[in-house]
């Protein structure tokens, strides 16, 4: 046992929290000690919520967003514009775009971007299901809203080639987002403007 910790149980709990992205051991220690001070019912509710989420959460069969049902609330909402699809990397990006209140279409979550260095290729992403949605004929515009990174640009280009020849407008969010920035960390105003001011994708955006 690390002599820094008075308890092996505490050390183990801190170690588990420290596995979370963006959580160092100091932050993990604060979180664990905070939970330790709470009533047992509070801690059990926290744990049960995580277990229930893991076992019962679903992924939308249409867009791959997280959902409580087979089809997410966005895809099943008749008030949304089904002729427009905003392509994003992750579920967090859907939440970021929704927070802008500037977009009323549907989404398509790829589950990542093409990154050979990380061993992620096109077949590891939800690209073919996007192509199938466009082939359905109802989609008139696909908005590429991936991060302004080399991997994001590579994925944009690949998608553009897959959709080449189809009767669909392909656009990309405006570059109000700095190069290298990830969508989820962009402020709502900037992201909203980037969507509104989107431009046609030329392969060099």
Swiss-Prot record:
The keyword Cell cycle does not apply. It comes from the Bacteria. A zinc finger (C4-type) spans 60-75. Disulfide bonds: none annotated. Residues 83-178 form the Toprim domain. GO terms for biological process: DNA recombination; DNA repair. Coiled coil: none annotated. Keywords: DNA damage, DNA recombination, DNA repair, Metal-binding, Zinc, Zinc-finger. GO terms for molecular function: DNA binding; zinc ion binding. The keyword DNA repair applies. InterPro entries: DNA_Rcmb_RecR (IPR000093), Rcmb_RecR (IPR023627), Rcmb_RecR_Znf (IPR015967), TOPRIM_dom (IPR006171), TOPRIM_RecR (IPR034137). SMART domains: TOPRIM. May play a role in DNA repair. It seems to be involved in an RecBC-independent recombinational process of DNA repair. It may act with RecF and RecO. HAMAP family: RecR. Belongs to the RecR family. NCBIfam families: recR. This is Recombination protein RecR. It comes from Phocaeicola vulgatus (strain ATCC 8482 / DSM 1447 / JCM 5826 / CCUG 4940 / NBRC 14291 / NCTC 11154) (Bacteroides vulgatus).
């Amino acid at each position: 046992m690390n002599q820094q910790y008075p308890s092996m149980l505490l050390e183990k709990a801190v170690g588990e929290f420290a596995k979370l992205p963006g959580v160092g051991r100091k932050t993990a220690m604060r979180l664990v000690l905070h939970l330790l001070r709470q009533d047992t019912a509070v801690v059990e509710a926290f744990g049960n919520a995580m277990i229930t989420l893991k076992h019962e959460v679903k992924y939308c069969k249409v867009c791959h967003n997280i959902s409580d049902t087979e089809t997410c609330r966005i895809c099943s909402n008749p008030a949304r514009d089904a002729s427009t699809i905003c392509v994003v990397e992750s579920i967090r990006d859907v939440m970021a775009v929704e927070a802008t209140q500037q977009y009323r279409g549907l989404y398509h979550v790829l589950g990542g971007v093409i990154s050979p260095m990380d061993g992620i290729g096109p077949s590891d992403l939800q690209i073919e299901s996007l192509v199938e949605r466009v082939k359905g004929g109802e989609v008139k515009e696909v908005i590429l809203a991936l991060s302004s990174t080399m991997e994001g640009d590579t994925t944009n280009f690949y998608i553009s080639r897959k959709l080449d020849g189809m009767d669909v407008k392909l656009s990309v969010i405006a570059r109000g987002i700095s190069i290298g920035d990830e969508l989820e960390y962009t402020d709502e105003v900037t992201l909203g403007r980037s969507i509104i001011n989107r431009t046609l994708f030329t392969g060099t955006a």
